Amino acid sequence: MNPTIYLSCLMVFSVFLLGKVNAENEDEFVTEKQRLFSVYGDSSVDEATKYRNIDSLVTFYDKYFTRLQLKPDLNTRAHDLLRRYKEENARVVLVDGTPAQGGFWLPLVKLLIVQLGVEIASEGVKRAIES
């Protein structure tokens, strides 16, 4: 096969794959954002559900924090809380695969993360109403 045709086909295929990956990432971002917004933005959702979704919220923020348009003070608080959460999670002692009972700081940090999630969701509602 002619090298020019081969390289052209390879380039078109590469651009197609990159566009598809970018579209999948965008879909994943929008889907997860909507799911977390429905958890933390809805006051009828119980606290247990919010606590169960903390890991998802932390993962989402780590992955997409550059795409979230938060106020600088809220962004700073989020970074600080997530850093503390990861530090406390790293200190958790597992007994037969489950965390040992006790400990004061991790539940406190989880409470603060839930409150942060609610605050970020309410900020999103305010922006949606304003625009």
Curated annotation (Swiss-Prot):
Record GO cellular component, one term:
extracellular region
**InterPro entries, per the entry:** Turandot
A Pfam family this protein belongs to?
Turandot
Q: Which cysteines are joined by disulfide bonds?
A: none
Q: Where is the signal peptide?
A: 1-23
GO aspect biological process, one term: innate immune response
Q: Where in the cell is it found?
A: Secreted
Lineage top rank: taxon: Eukaryota
Q: Give the induction note.
A: By a variety of stressful conditions including bacterial infection and heat shock.
- Keywords, comma-separated and alphabetical: Immunity, Innate immunity, Secreted, Signal
- Main function: A humoral factor that may play a role in stress tolerance. Requires Mekk1 expression in the fat body to regulate response to septic injury and consequent immune response.
Q: Which family does it belong to?
A: Belongs to the Turandot family.
Task: State what protein this is by name.
Answer: Protein Turandot M
Give the gene symbol. Answer: TotM
